[in-house]
Amino acid sequence: MAETDIAMPESTPVDSRPAFAIVEELKTKFGENFYVQTTCEEFPTVWVERSRVQEVLMFLRKVDRPYVMLFDLSAMDERLRVHRDGLPASDFTVFYHLLSLERNSDIRIKVALNESDLNIPTATNIWPNANWYEREAYDMFGINFEGHPMLRRILLPTYWEGHPLRKEYSARATEYTPYMQNQAKQDFEQEHLRFVPEDWGLKRGNADEDFMFLNLGPNHPSAHGAFRVVLQLDGEEVKDCVPDIGYHHRGVEKMAERQTWHSFIPYTDRVDYLGGCAQNMPYVMAVEQLAGIKVPERAQVIRVMLNELFRINNHLLFCGTAIQDAGGMTPVFYMFADRQKVYDIVEAITGYRMHPAWFRIGGTAHDLPNNWHKLVKELLEWMPKRLNEYHTAALKNSVFIGRTRNVAQYDAKSALAWGVTGTGLRATGIDFDVRKYRPYSGYENFDFDVPLEYEGDAYARVMVHFREITESLKIIQQCLDNMPSGPYKADHPLAVPPPKDKTLQDIETLITHFLSVSWGPVMPAGEASFMTEVVKGASTYYLTSDKSTMSYRTRIRTPTFTHLQQMPSVINGSLVSDLIIYLATIDVVMADVDR
């Protein structure tokens, strides 16, 4: 063991669950010096010595039935964590969340670091999408990934001071002196914004010619949000490009440390502001996993129905704007009219439209209203006819096909290497849909197909989105036909807010209700995460509780952060016009990327 490595506790007993078989494979290959952490999850969390982490990661990448995807990578400041009995000593912990499609299982690898030595080898030579994840961990925690090709800030400006997800970094504006802007500070910030190609890893030219550099964004209609792409051009050809993100960053993971488990729910709506209730799902289910709450069947089906309504709304907007960016102006206006019908249902059920924040820990905010089924029936009768019109008039249009066929194309191997999930992965022929692979909230009881395309181009991505609308309608029809009776919220002391009907009957229930609503519930110490298929791909909330009313660490893995990172590998060598089509068909919302 290297001098800077941190000793492991004694090995833990073998777990017989299938997902834990990989632990024995690791021990066979590397010996017994691993520590398997107990969590609330159905897959192993294994602590590894820093000196062996690259070997272990490479083994997992190449093992039989390999862990082909680096699903997430981040860190945690453990210095103020109280309830970590038995865990290896660690000031900062770096973790790698890996996914195996063949095993249909995950593994989390953890590495303990001492505050005085925050160096760890890069994983970019194993998974290319480690690039942005490591830059984010450097930006937020100050972790130094040795061998990284361009370790610089990614979400914050280069002149930013400090690392915001460290515990000494204040979370409230009231803890800072008032912000003052003067000419010297303005000049300093502007100078740091000066474009220097070498800072971005770009060459100014070659022996024969100079390249032109062009900023697409940060305010460009085809960027679908505030972000910039620095283009290195030779005429119309894109020689190289570098996405520049962070314009929407608002520190949502830091906010989670100062909100109660319940009061953080509205923030989840706004990670992907088009996802609505679907964005609540991974968070509340992770909290329920942590608390051991079993959600009633009626609440599960209601959640599924709301999820699919927001999936339809997202996909209608996606298809309309994709066609618009390819030159077809009319369909997007019709699709916006259809989206209003969905929003009418959402508003009737939740009281709000885009940001309902309606799911609760243990169920939903309230029951379905009277005559809810009438609006749903109208949508189910209306949408199939409209979809037929869109398919005939727009998606079979020769101009649209010409602009999207064989454009911005990538294969399944590339998609997995870059961590692509959702429709972008299914457009390459891989049928990974969390609702099917790992059913949750009763999805195993629904009959629906997973649409696939195989070309991996822009047209394939549009068609997968479009066909998924039909499948969502099928699921909603089954919700309508088979809505269970019963409660809409779990009768559990940690469900929030707790049932109010008994508060007038005995003082103990009244006190519990008061504490839960005012201070928030105290969740058991431990770790939990939950993966769901949100509207843009697979999303996970990884929660660490230190037995408090607030989360100690909330890690939000969003799908589009890694989708956007794939851009140079797809677009380099193409035309600028192809970049526009690419951006139109990867379904990116910048709030989801930047968090």
Curated annotation (Swiss-Prot):
<keyword id="KW-1278">Translocase</keyword>
<keyword id="KW-0874">Quinone</keyword>
<dbReference type="InterPro" id="IPR001268">
    <property type="entry name" value="NADH_UbQ_OxRdtase_30kDa_su"/>
</dbReference>
<dbReference type="InterPro" id="IPR023062">
    <property type="entry name" value="NADH_DH_suCD"/>
</dbReference>
<dbReference type="InterPro" id="IPR010218">
    <property type="entry name" value="NADH_DH_suC"/>
</dbReference>
<keyword id="KW-0997">Cell inner membrane</keyword>
<keyword id="KW-1003">Cell membrane</keyword>
<dbReference type="InterPro" id="IPR001135">
    <property type="entry name" value="NADH_Q_OxRdtase_suD"/>
</dbReference>
<comment type="similarity">
    <text>In the C-terminal section; belongs to the complex I 49 kDa subunit family.</text>
</comment>
<comment type="subunit">
    <text>NDH-1 is composed of 13 different subunits. Subunits NuoB, CD, E, F, and G constitute the peripheral sector of the complex.</text>
</comment>
<dbReference type="GO" id="GO:0030964">
    <property type="term" value="C:NADH dehydrogenase complex"/>
</dbReference>
<dbReference type="GO" id="GO:0051287">
    <property type="term" value="F:NAD binding"/>
</dbReference>
<comment type="similarity">
    <text>In the N-terminal section; belongs to the complex I 30 kDa subunit family.</text>
</comment>
<dbReference type="GO" id="GO:0048038">
    <property type="term" value="F:quinone binding"/>
</dbReference>
<dbReference type="GO" id="GO:0008137">
    <property type="term" value="F:NADH dehydrogenase (ubiquinone) activity"/>
</dbReference>
<keyword id="KW-0813">Transport</keyword>
<dbReference type="GO" id="GO:0005886">
    <property type="term" value="C:plasma membrane"/>
</dbReference>
<dbReference type="InterPro" id="IPR020396">
    <property type="entry name" value="NADH_UbQ_OxRdtase_CS"/>
</dbReference>
<keyword id="KW-0472">Membrane</keyword>
<keyword id="KW-0830">Ubiquinone</keyword>
<dbReference type="InterPro" id="IPR029014">
    <property type="entry name" value="NiFe-Hase_large"/>
</dbReference>
<keyword id="KW-0511">Multifunctional enzyme</keyword>
<dbReference type="Pfam" id="PF00346">
    <property type="entry name" value="Complex1_49kDa"/>
</dbReference>
<dbReference type="InterPro" id="IPR037232">
    <property type="entry name" value="NADH_quin_OxRdtase_su_C/D-like"/>
</dbReference>
<dbReference type="Pfam" id="PF00329">
    <property type="entry name" value="Complex1_30kDa"/>
</dbReference>
<dbReference type="GO" id="GO:0050136">
    <property type="term" value="F:NADH:ubiquinone reductase (non-electrogenic) activity"/>
</dbReference>
<keyword id="KW-0520">NAD</keyword>
<dbReference type="InterPro" id="IPR022885">
    <property type="entry name" value="NDH1_su_D/H"/>
</dbReference>
<protein>
    <recommendedName>
        <fullName>NADH-quinone oxidoreductase subunit C/D</fullName>
        <ecNumber>7.1.1.-</ecNumber>
    </recommendedName>
</protein>
<feature type="region of interest" description="NADH dehydrogenase I subunit C">
    <location>
        <begin position="1"/>
        <end position="186"/>
    </location>
</feature>
<comment type="function">
    <text>NDH-1 shuttles electrons from NADH, via FMN and iron-sulfur (Fe-S) centers, to quinones in the respiratory chain. The immediate electron acceptor for the enzyme in this species is believed to be ubiquinone. Couples the redox reaction to proton translocation (for every two electrons transferred, four hydrogen ions are translocated across the cytoplasmic membrane), and thus conserves the redox energy in a proton gradient.</text>
</comment>
<dbReference type="InterPro" id="IPR014029">
    <property type="entry name" value="NADH_UbQ_OxRdtase_49kDa_CS"/>
</dbReference>
<feature type="region of interest" description="NADH dehydrogenase I subunit D">
    <location>
        <begin position="210"/>
        <end position="595"/>
    </location>
</feature>
